Swiss-Prot record:
Organism name: Magnetococcus marinus (strain ATCC BAA-1437 / JCM 17883 / MC-1)
UniProt keyword annotations, A-Z: Ribonucleoprotein, Ribosomal protein
InterPro entries registered for this protein in UniProt: Ribosomal_protein_uL29, Ribosomal_uL29, Ribosomal_uL29_sf
Name the UniProt record assigns to this protein: Large ribosomal subunit protein uL29
GO terms for MF: structural constituent of ribosome
One biological process term in Gene Ontology: translation
Family in the record: Belongs to the universal ribosomal protein uL29 family.
HAMAP family for this protein: Ribosomal_uL29
Presence of the UniProt keyword Ribonucleoprotein in the record: yes
Domain of life according to the entry: Bacteria
GO CC annotations, alphabetized: cytosolic large ribosomal subunit
Keyword set includes ATP-binding: no
Length: 67
């Protein structure tokens, strides 16, 4: 199952919780990167894309509710 389909099955509350956790992780990754402690720099990109995917799924649900 893809990440997008898994997120589409999650509730909005669960998506919000996951997004908050990802924002915190992104902050920590940026801090580690700035202090040259980050080994896996590609994780920054992965986290950014997961946040974007969550925002997209939430937007799809809001658009669907308005119709």
């Amino acid at each position: 199952m893809s990440v997008a389909s898994e997120m589409r099955e999650m509730s909005v509350e669960a998506l919000d919780d996951k997004m908050k956790a990802l924002y915190q992780e992104a902050f920590n990754l940026r801090f580690q990167h700035a202090t040259a402690q980050l080994e896996n720099t590609s994780r920054i990109r992965q986290v950014r894309r997961e946040i974007a995917l969550i925002k997209t799924v939430i937007g799809e649900r809001k658009a669907k509710e308005e119709v």
